[in-house]
From Swiss-Prot:
Short sequence motif 'HIGH' region: positions: 45-55
Protein localization: Cytoplasm
GO molecular function terms listed in the Swiss-Prot or TrEMBL record: aminoacyl-tRNA deacylase activity; ATP binding; leucine-tRNA ligase activity
Pfam families, alphabetized: Anticodon_1, tRNA-synt_1, tRNA-synt_1_2, tRNA-synt_1g
Motif ('KMSKS' region): 619-623
Organism: Hyphomonas neptunium (strain ATCC 15444)
The protein's name: Leucine--tRNA ligase
EC number, UniProt record: 6.1.1.4
Length: 855
């Protein structure tokens, strides 16, 4: 009698068996001679305390890859850790009066238990959290090595300052010009900050990203644009009339469009340009203007979105190509001091930002690029700048030239006059890593009045965070700690003070993959790196992934990594999100999916029985309460169902919508698989597969399915692999009442159990045991296929009459062309079209098509 599979009892049992046998512990290279290696890594999580379905999808994908590689004979490293520093822990400390460390480690234990329930094949022996002193101590040692190499330095830099919380805010924490928590207007302040010199690798990072063939093209393009290599001209506009002290030679500007110099109608300085600062010393109005600019966030995006602000300095400069023509000098809030020279020339006709500025302040607009086919006498620029192709006009010696030729000619003219030179610039800026927060990696330096900045000796690392801190007042607890920051200088022994800034948490995640490879063994790191398959969200395309590429190069160059290419991730996959419908009560309150029910095509609130407004399908978020608790899904259906559904319903790079009906369908399929396996005799051994037509057809189905699943996993088409498994199970079940197919069915069940391991490992183990096996299928090899059973001996051809498809025919691959022709003409749907007509010729293209031409 058939039994029912019970995931609630089966899944814990198999997880215990895996852990007892310790089957996911990574083998040392010497213990896996001859085996290829596979380092599979998903972006490690922040320990927020609860998993969400996005986590389930991300880590289920990585587990498919890791389990598949193991079954294919690879030595697999599939680790897990915690990206544990950051602001949420400090916020919890303030709100709940609990130490950030206590809150973080409690969350880690909670999430680890959730991960365990998912049946992930993780090597927990390599687990660490970035807030572990061992980890951040190694990071501090690395910081000092980079500092010795000249890749770390300090400089004054603009930051977003919250005057109420007394802290620096990241750009994303500034909302409409106000602090995200205090609501206070944010100020721009200049603070001395620590920087990593990522620009030292700009060319290498840009050139190498195009060689990452196993990265999504979208991510490679995003990184290339972020690095932003631009060739242009750095030139000096000489003053016409008054020459401010220190700027007697003029104003140096950088432009990527020297072809539009004849269209220049203003020069604009950054509010932080040295000349602006000098002029502001004698102008209260300019001081007030700079203060207004300082209320805007420091990010390019914030500045770009802000209203265009301008201040006329009253100064003018001479146009380099038109004697007697002068150009006014303004200060503009959209000019960045950190890019180029901190000054630009504006050509409103061919740059939208310049045009918006010019229209607001009544500045001239001179078109100098004529679109193809446009009338030079009639062409005008309206509210949109023209940034397309064309040739140069109204530009003296540049007239008639293409844009590229005009750029070269303008640069040559400026260089010949000694007014500037062609130059390459980058959008990429050095990475500011100072954070005025407690819960982060302490920067391992001390400040001595006599010796300056002194690195902490290696013997004194890690510089540990003090435990006795309070969060009852705003600001950095390290700054106001009575003892921690006071220390003797390691060089001269005199009283000094510790650096109280901590490192940006992106530093923690920029080298963790190397720590997973080995804590300290350079040979083991060389063996495992680069990561063979990295999996995570596309939102990390620029910052995390770019910083990691910088760090791996820097670590290589200070002798920490034997990684000639400098690339940390050979393959990258960016998965889509898990989405869900949104629900609102009649009063407009967001409702959780568990708070609503469907009846007769309508949705009602369970508590009140009132109708619910069903909103858009969106990314799961706490704010809109459209989240599904993985623990609840596991408790109801089992982990295999959760894993199966998030992988089955959509290509992995696209979003997947979580639905109750989808989960129920996955649960039914689990029972369908079990009912097939359980239909086999309980005692073996099973007979060898028969050679009758039905058994042979079933064996072909078995072997073709394995080949298709194998290929789909390799190509990250997990949903296709799952679709193949569905079809395969259907084929197997159709023959379960035929005694002659027992051998072929038993072969199929054995292969199916092995192929289910990457997707539904608990069910796979139960099926394996039901087949009489005493080992763990998670340690079994991938099924071997018989090539002769995978190759079709028939082929299906399209049959056309006068080029129009009328039918199709399946014939033996080696059937003679004249026999194919005769069979095609005999098809009813073909015979009716050629009856009574003269067949002029018949074209048979082997393996593809039959075309009958009639008159």
């Amino acid at each position: 009698m058939a039994t029912r599979y019970d995931p609630q009892s089966a899944e814990p049992r198999w997880r215990d068996a895996w852990e007892k046998a310790d089957i996911f512990r990574t083998k040392a290279p010497k213990d896996a001679p001859g085996a290829p290696k596979a380092f599979v890594l998903e972006m490690f999580p922040y320990p927020s305390g609860r998993l969400h379905m996005g986590h389930v999808r991300n880590y289920a994908m990585g587990d498919v890859v890791a389990r598949h590689k193991r079954a294919k004979g690879y030595n697999v490293l599939h680790p897990m850790g915690w990206d544990a520093f950051g602001m949420p822990a400090e916020n919890a400390a303030m709100e709940r009066k609990v130490h950030p460390g206590k809150w973080t480690y409690a969350n880690i234990e909670s999430m680890k238990a959730q991960f365990r329930k998912l049946g992930l094949s993780l090597d927990w022996s390599r687990e660490f959290a970035t807030c572990d002193p061992d980890y951040y101590g190694a990071q501090q040692a690395l910081f000092l090595k980079l500092m010795d190499k000249g890749l770390v330095y300090r400089k004054a830099s603009k930051v977003n300052w919250d005057p109420v919380d007394n802290t620096v805010l990241a750009n994303e924490q500034v909302i409409d010009g106000r602090g995200w928590r205090s609501g206070a207007p944010v100020e721009q302040r200049e603070l001395t900050q620590w920087f990593f010199k990522i620009t030292a690798y700009a060319d290498d990072l840009l050139e190498a990203v195009q060689k990452l063939e196993r990265w999504p093209e979208k991510v490679r393009t995003m990184q290339a644009n972020w690095i932003g290599r631009s060739e242009g001209l750095e030139m000096t506009f000489a003053f016409d009339g008054e020459r401010p002290a220190g700027f007697e030679d003029g104003i140096s500007v950088f432009t990527t469009r020297p072809d539009t110099l004849f269209g220049a109608s203003f020069v604009a300085l950054s509010p932080d340009h040295p000349l602006t600062l000098q002029l502001a010393e004698k102008s209260d109005a300019l001081q007030a203007f700079r203060a207004k600019c300082a209320q805007i966030g420091t990010s390019e995006e914030a500045i770009e979105k802000a209203e265009k602000l301008g201040f006329d300095t009253g100064l003018t400069v001479a146009h380099p190509f038109e004697p007697g023509r002068t150009v006014p000098v303004w200060v503009a809030n959209f000019v960045l001091m950190g890019y180029g020279t901190g000054a630009i020339f504006g050509c409103p006709a061919h740059d939208q930002r310049d045009l918006d500025f010019a229209r607001k302040f009544g500045l001239d607009v001179f078109p100098v690029v004529l679109p193809p086919g446009a009338d030079a006498a009639a062409f005008e620029v309206g509210i949109e700048a023209y940034t397309g192709p064309g040739h140069i006009y109204k530009s003296g010696f540049l007239d008639g030239l293409s844009i590229d030729d005009a750029k070269r000619a303008a640069i040559a003219k400026i260089e010949a006059a000694g007014q500037g030179e062609g130059k390459v610039n980058y959008r990429l800026r050095d990475w500011g890593v100072s954070r005025q927060r407690y819960w982060g990696c302490p920067i391992p330096v001390v400040h001595c009045e006599d010796c300056g900045v002194v690195g902490v000796p290696a013997a004194d690392l890690p510089v540990r965070l003090p435990e006795d801190v309070t969060f009852d007042v705003p600001g950095n607890p390290l700054d106001r700690h009575p003892d921690w920051k006071h220390v003797d200088c390691p060089k001269c022994g005199k009283p000094a003070r510790r650096e109280t800034d901590t490192l940006d948490t992106f530093v923690d995640s920029s080298w963790y993959y190397a720590r997973f490879a080995s804590v300290s063994d350079p040979e083991e790191r060389a063996y495992w790196l680069p990561v063979d398959q990295y999996i995570g969200g596309v939102e990390h395309a620029v910052l995390h992934l770019l910083y990691s590429r910088f760090f791996s190069r820097a670590m290589r160059d200070v002798g920490e990594l034997d990684l000639p290419s400098g690339e940390p991730f050979a393959g990258l996959f960016t998965q889509g999100m898990v989405t869900h419908e949104t629900y609102r009560s009649e009063g407009g309150t967001w409702l959780e999916p568990s708070a609503v029910e469907r009846k007769d095509g309508q949705v009602f609130e369970i508590a009140t029985g009132k109708p619910v407004k069903v909103g858009a399908i969106e990314k799961m978020s706490k704010s809109k309460k459209n989240t599904v608790d993985p623990d609840a899904i596991v408790a109801t259906y089992g982990a295999d169902v959760a894993r199966w559904f998030v992988l089955s319903d959509s290509p992995p790079e696209r979003d997947v919508e979580w639905t109750q009906s989808g989960a129920e369908g996955a649960a039914r399929f689990v029972q369908r698989v079990w009912s097939f396996v359980d239909s086999l005799p309980e005692t073996g051994p099973f007979p060898a597969p028969g050679s009758d037509d039905v058994s042979t057809a079933l064996r072909k189905s078995n072997h073709k399915a394995v080949a298709a699943i194998d290929r789909a996993i390799e190509e990250f088409r997990f949903n296709s692999a799952i679709a193949t498994i569905h079809e395969w199970v259907n084929a197997l079940k159709k023959t379960e009442s035929d005694p002659a197919t027992l051998g072929a069915r038993a072969e199929g069940a054995d292969m199916l159990a092995r192929c289910l391991v990457p997707f539904m490992p608990h069910l796979a183990e139960a099926c394996w045991e039901r087949l009489g096996q005493t080992s763990l299928v998670s340690q079994a090899m991938w099924p071997k296929i018989d090539a002769s059973l995978v190759v079709d001996d028939t082929v299906t051809l399209a049959v056309q009459v006068n080029g129009k498809r009328r039918a199709e025919i399946t014939v033996a691959k080696d059937m003679a062309p004249d026999a194919v022709e005769a069979a095609a003409k005999a098809l009813p749907d073909v015979a009716s079209f050629i009856a009574g007509k003269s067949v002029k010729k018949t074209i048979v293209v082997p393996g593809r098509i039959v075309n009958i031409v009639v008159a």
